[in-house]
Amino acid sequence: MMPSAATVRAIYRCLLRDARELQRTPHFNIRRELKLEQWGVGGFVEPLPVQEETRGTNDPRVLTSLEEFRRLRDDAFRMGSPSIDVDASAKLDEAIETLSELSDQLLLAQCSSVTVTDGVRIEASSKYVQSHSNPASNTYRFTYRVTITNQNEECSIQILGRQYTFESEKGQRVALPRNSPGIVGATPLLAPGQTFEYGSGVDIDAPRGSVTGCLHAVRKTEDDDDGELFDVLVSKFALVAPHTPGNR
């Protein structure tokens, strides 16, 4: 069964809406999905291929789908009636998949932050865990991922501890105090260019909230192995439970 003109038009408009919203999002990049299994787990991350690092909002797959979908829409409605063949129908299926991915990426972008402090880049992202939440008892669980990259060229960075404050829109505050030791039981040493990431989580009493904090680090060089202590900022990032009562 061929898709109707109304279906084509509706999906096309949704694609453009989400794509435009993503393009307005600071520090946008294609992010991997957060998984509950990452909670309490950390490790070093292999560098991405160059083409993956530079995709950003110019993701060839996404932009190609949008451009082809625009052409499909224009061709279908130029004469006032759709003329969608089998190949075009397949393209429509691709557009629907792209729409789903764009929506997921948009929510991830809205729940992320990126900060660079003294050559250390921190990207933090969160995701609502519906399967472990109970809105009826005001329990909303979120998992979050923190990715640490040492962008310095002449020194290593060791993460010694952390401090976080979790706040809900109802005013609840959950504090992880300053100098809480390590991250997921480790004090990773990052050589120049290395990346370490870990996952954790929190329960709050509302479908919306935020996280702010810092990581305690020491800068180490060949001349000074004891190093210089400093804080690496983790900029505020949102906790958002989509499609919950009062949050639509």
Predicted regions and their residues:
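Short, solvent-exposed beta-strand/turn "edge" segments of beta-rich domains on protein surfaces
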Residues: 128-141, 152-155, 188-192, 204-206
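Short acidic, flexible loop segments centered on an aromatic residue
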Residues: 154-174, 217
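Short, solvent-exposed loop/turn segments enriched in Ser/Thr/Gly
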Residues: 139-145, 212
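Terminal connector regions
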Residues: 201-248
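Intrinsically disordered, low-complexity, basic-enriched segments
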Residues: 1-121, 127-129
